Each structure stands twice: as C-alpha cells, then as structure tokens.
Amino acid sequence: MGQIVTFFQEVPHVIEEVMNIVLIALSVLAVLKGLYNFATCGLVGLVTFLLLCGRSCTTSLYKGVYELQTLELNMETLNMTMPLSCTKNNSHHYIMVGNETGLELTLTNTSIINHKFCNLSDAHKKNLYDHALMSIISTFHLSIPNFNQYEAMSCDFNGGKISVQYNLSHSYAGDAANHCGTVANGVLQTFMRMAWGGSYIALDSGRGNWDCIMTSYQYLIIQNTTWEDHCQFSRPSPIGYLGLLSQRTRDIYISRRLLGTFTWTLSDSEGKDTPGGYCLTRWMLIEAELKCFGNTAVAKCNEKHDEEFCDMLRLFDFNKQAIQRLKAEAQMSIQLINKAVNALINDQLIMKNHLRDIMGIPYCNYSKYWYLNHTTTGRTSLPKCWLVSNGSYLNETHFSDDIEQQADNMITEMLQKEYMERQGKTPLGLVDLFVFSTSFYLISIFLHLVKIPTHRHIVGKSCPKPHRLNHMGICSCGLYKQPGVPVKWKR
C-alpha cells in the first residue's frame, strides 16, 4: 500500500520533468525558427547588397537560382505529315510536301496563262494532277473571302503540271479606289496567311489598316515544283497552312465550343496518353541535343490551350504517331491533318499572332522559345514564345519583366508544393503555438513586417536585378551608366 502511495506522489514530478523536456525542445525550435526568420527578413540581403552594390552584373540568373535558356524547334521534321511553308525572297514563296515535291507561290508582273477559265472537273476526270498538292491549292482558294469573280482565276494542267494564276490588277478605276473590298485584296490576305510569319513579304500596305493589303505586282502564280534549298529567308513552318485550314473549318462550324475541340493529349516517352514528362529529341531542335520538360510543365499543356509551345508539342507528337501508322503516305497524311487540325492547335492564337505581325506588333513565329531552369533542382518552366519584331528576335531586356514574373510563379508553385508536403507529414499546431509565444519569434516577425529594403531601384523604372546599383544609380557593368539619377530602396 505504501508503494502505491509513493508512486502516485512521484507522478507530478515525472510530469514536470516531461514538461521541462518538451519546453526545452520547443524553445530550441523557436530559437532556430527565429534565426531562420532573421536570415530571411532582408537584413542579411541588405548587408550583402551594400557589400556588392555596383559590382555584380550577372545577366543569366534571375531570383538567384533561375537561369534563362532557349530552344529553337526544327519543323522540317514535320514535312511528312503536314505542308510546310517558307520564303526564298520577296517574290518567291514555297509550300513543301514530303521530301521531293512542293508548290511555288510567285508574285510577278508576267502572265503565264492567256485564257480566263479553270476546267477543274475535266482535269479531275483525267487525273492530271497530284491530289496532295491540289488539296493544298483547294484550301488556299476556299479561304479567299467572297471570291465571286471567276475570271480573276485561270489554271492549266497540261502534262500533269499544275499552274494556277490569280489576277491582282483591277479592271475598273472604281475597284482600284476601293481595293480593300475587292477579290484582289482577298487573294493577298489569304496569300499572306499562307506564307505567314514574315515581315519580309514585299507588300505595300498604304492605308494603315491591317485588312487592306496592296502590292505593285499584277499576278500571283502557283505552280508545282521540285523541292530544293528554297528556304533562305525563313525556316519551314506548318503554321501558315494550318492557320488557313483551321480558320476555314471554324467558318463552317461556327457554333463549335473552343475548348471542346482540343482532344489531343501529349503522350509520355513510352507512348502512353497520360500527362507526364516530354522530351524533344535532337531531330526536333536546331543546334541542340535532347531537352526534357517535367510533369509540371507538360501537364499545363494538357490542361490549358493558350500557349504556342503546347501547340507545337502536339504537332510533333501527332507527326510521330502519324508516321508510325500511315507510313508517311503524302495524300493520306494531308487528309488526316485536315481532319485533326482543330484537335491540335489553337487557331485563335495563330490569328492573333498573324494580326500582330501585320500591325507591326511583336509576334510569335512558333520557332524560338525561352524558359527558366532551376540551377539546383533542374525544374523547368513551360517555355514561352520569343517574340519577333521587324524580322529579328527581341532583345532579352524587352521582356525582362515577363522573365521576373515567370520566376515568381515558379517560386510560388514550389512553395505551395513544399507546404502541401509539409502539412501532410508534420503536425505543426503545437510547435507554432509555442513559437508565437516567444519574444524572440515576435521580434523576427516584426522585422518581416518592417520589410527591410535590400536593393535600389531607379525611380519610375522596373527592377534592375540581377544588376546592383550604387547610390549614384549606376552599375559597373555599363548597362546603367547615367550617374545622378534618382534612386529609391526596395525590398
């Protein structure tokens, strides 16, 4: 009986010792968390900046850990399943089908057909032409808005050679004065969309209106030709033809829901149709080896359809699977892409970039892309299009704000993922309750609320990072070289 009484007398002491151990452990955690808050509140960053200001001018890293990288897509690999367009000079443009044949679209002042008719039915009965090439011409012709002057088109199929001629001149002075609403303007509009993505096309737009295209040439001639080294002004791209095709399909089925048309999901490296990582082989890239993008980036392509890079991934994926199943038969491949185009690309994106090109606004040519790579984890962002203006790619400084925003988005995604993982593993309620009760932690929280500044900004301009400005507003690298400009501290 005495032993039982002694045991119960010792219980409070045991509980007290346990509580002491718990309090010591929580105090250590509170001190460690307070030290962490001191390290991240900006004080260390401020001291580091004061020591390094005006010296470090690294341009390859953003937010300290994200490196800007680029890739260029080689769209010549798509030639077996979809027509590619490119340009040789101001007047000669080409459509590539397969490895040997194609179409030449020429702006000229010399007529090659004297008559004013086009006997398509007779040519079809005699099987005079290549049906793969003719389907491309049909897509072009059916895309011309309000084509109601059949004498403006002539064609000839002698010996299997395709020759189609559009008259761009005006028979009446009234038509010349009202060029914007004529068939000639419609032909030029469609031509610029077929040979899309080139401010190098010599068309004089003298009215300042994007839908009014004028030229000094009198004829547009389309002929079949052998495929040689024609692409001297631009690389081959399927976007022009696919843009025409999807726009014509949208005009026919105007009531379709946009999101309902996107049904193609990217397969993984094993060909499975589940969202996952996706790798671009060296055959798909220009002057680059294998590049892979993880689940996080590629899953966005399967969820959303508002990025040009996602459209190109779908085209490459479609091309790979179509070649395996169709054995690269040209006519069958073109028929398939005609039916599948609305499941692969966002025609609104193509139209938007085409209009931006005509209006002189930087646009996407679907060839070059930039993305951020985490130098430690290797995690990448979803590549975004590197915009083109006046025939050349923009300088990196023109979209530095977009790069900073992309880095912020990646940091936010990483923190959200880490938070969810931590919440699923560690019960933080008791620890946080005690931590918030310590004065050391309250001081660290106060420093966070104060928001100690860490670097200087030029008044009225964006963040200069990764450049470091001194009190005169200059950086020793030479980019910011005007001394005496007003600066202010920012966190």
Curated annotation (Swiss-Prot):
Residues 2-17, 59-432 are extracellular. Disulfide bonds join C86-C231, C118-C155, C180-C212, C279-C292, C301-C310, C364-C385. The record marks K33 as: Important for GP-C-mediated membrane fusion. The chain crosses the membrane at residues 18-33, 433-453. The record marks T58, T59, L259, G260 as: Cleavage. A lipid is attached at G2 (N-myristoyl glycine). The lineage of its organism: Viruses, Riboviria, Orthornavirae, Negarnaviricota, Polyploviricotina. It comes from Lassa virus (strain Mouse/Sierra Leone/Josiah/1976) (LASV). Zn(2+) 2 binds at H455, H457, C463. Belongs to the arenaviridae GPC protein family. This is Pre-glycoprotein polyprotein GP complex. The keyword Lipoprotein applies. One of its GO terms (cellular component) is membrane. Changing S60A: No effect on SSP cleavage.
